[in-house]
Swiss-Prot record:
Protein family (similarity comment): Belongs to the RnpA family.
Protein name: Ribonuclease P protein component
NCBIfam families linked: rnpA (TIGR00188)
Annotated EC: 3.1.26.5
Gene3D superfamilies reported in the protein's UniProt record: 3.30.230.10
Gene name tied to this protein: rnpA
Subunit-level organization: Consists of a catalytic RNA component (M1 or rnpB) and a protein subunit.
Chemical reaction(s) catalysed: Endonucleolytic cleavage of RNA, removing 5'-extranucleotides from tRNA precursor
PANTHER family hit by this protein: RIBONUCLEASE P PROTEIN COMPONENT
Keywords, in A-Z order: Endonuclease, Hydrolase, Nuclease, RNA-binding, tRNA processing
A GO biological process held by the record: tRNA 5'-leader removal
Cellular component, GO annotation: ribonuclease P complex
Pfam families (alphabetical): Ribonuclease_P (PF00825)
SUPFAM superfamilies: Ribosomal protein S5 domain 2-like
Length: 123
């Protein structure tokens, strides 16, 4: 049975890890958010979150977005490729309700799964 936890090993913690993803990422985005990805050397997908105060002024709004993204990642982690993912919030993300945000993120995860399969088939 697969564990559906979001442990420390599944998180991007150091700035150098984020920088590696920002250098040459695969992108999947909508008007409100972007998920960047880059292949990693570990055998699990990892997630980093960036939600700028510029886009969401209140801490509870930023925390809501991060909580939904973490939950989505936690449920989808065993289907995702071994990539480092960075979630980037854009202007207007605060206007999305929880269900819409969850569905949008799920669609972007699916797009990243497809992108990784295409990249593997080229190699």
């Amino acid at each position: 049975m697969n564990k559906l936890t979001f442990s420390r090993e599944l998180r991007l913690l150091a700035p150098i890890q984020f920088k590696a993803v920002f250098e040459q990422p695969y992108r999947a985005s909508t008007a409100e958010l972007t998920i960047l990805a880059r292949q990693n050397c570990v055998n699990t997908p990892r997630l980093g979150l960036t939600v700028a105060k510029k886009h969401l002024k209140r801490a509870h709004d930023r925390n809501r977005i991060k909580r939904i993204v973490r939950e989505s990642f936690r449920l989808k982690q065993h289907q995702l490729p071994n990539f480092d993912f960075v979630f980037v919030a854009k202007h207007g993300i605060g206007k999305l309700d929880n269900a819409t945000l969850f569905a949008t993120i799920d669609k972007l995860w699916t797009r990243h799964i497809r992108l990784s399969q295409q990249a593997q088939s080229k190699n």
